[in-house]
Amino acid sequence: MDIKVKDFEGPLDLLLHLVSKYEVDVYQVPIVEVIEQYLAYIETLQAMRLELAGEYMLMASQLMLIKSRRLLPKLVDKEPDEEDLEQELLGKIEEYSRFKALSQELASQHDKRALLFSKPKQELIFEQAVLQKDKTVMDLFLAFSQLMAAKQEAFKYNHTVIERDDYRIEDMMELIEARLELEQELTLTDLLKHCDHLNEAITLFLASLELIKRQLVGIEQTSHFGQIVLRKEIQ
């Protein structure tokens, strides 16, 4: 059977769990120890004759390569890409950590706002969004999380209790559509630039996803980790 390893969503989620136990910056963790724990966990599941999703095994092979290079006698200088492999892995874990924290914050905000309404609670719209142009919800979340990290200090000083009616997804959808009528295209950075409160930014982001889901707005990202561009779709 194909299993969901414990409560983990994928190999990065498992690695993040292992890294977080050290309670230090992700770049300070003893990487070989983390790799050994990951491999031990996977081996245990295999010993129990449980089938694993291929992504876990692919990550295991990459981790074994990093571990072997770390433990080889230093008879020669480091391979040019040896350190790059480690840094790339740690960077992915750090990105995933931000994505997961943001996802939890969005879910928390949704739950809090739902308490202010008598209508039945609805699932978060981004969970069912089907994006276009080979982009995924993860791409949008990563871009959004980077922008939110940059605005974290500003939000801290502008923290107030916002009533749900102050920021409504429907209103934000109209705002985005109006801006796209004037500007033709809009980056996610420009869209969120003037947000003073976290709730405002979150509502704008959810409104963007709803417009994309309804195929009223398209997105484009010309390079990995590049700007997310929103454009009005021609009906």
Swiss-Prot record:
The regions listed as transmembrane in this protein's record are none
Q: What is this protein called?
A: Segregation and condensation protein A
The record ties this protein, via InterPro entries, to:
ScpA, ScpA-like_C
Q: Which gene encodes it?
A: scpA
Main location, first listed in the record: cytoplasm
The question of whether Cytoplasm is a record keyword is answered with yes
Q: Which UniProt keywords apply?
A: Cell cycle, Cell division, Chromosome partition, Cytoplasm
Say which species the protein is native to.
Streptococcus equi subsp. equi (strain 4047)
| Pfam families found in the cross-reference section | SMC_ScpA
Q: Its quaternary structure?
A: Component of a cohesin-like complex composed of ScpA, ScpB and the Smc homodimer, in which ScpA and ScpB bind to the head domain of Smc. The presence of the three proteins is required for the association of the complex with DNA.
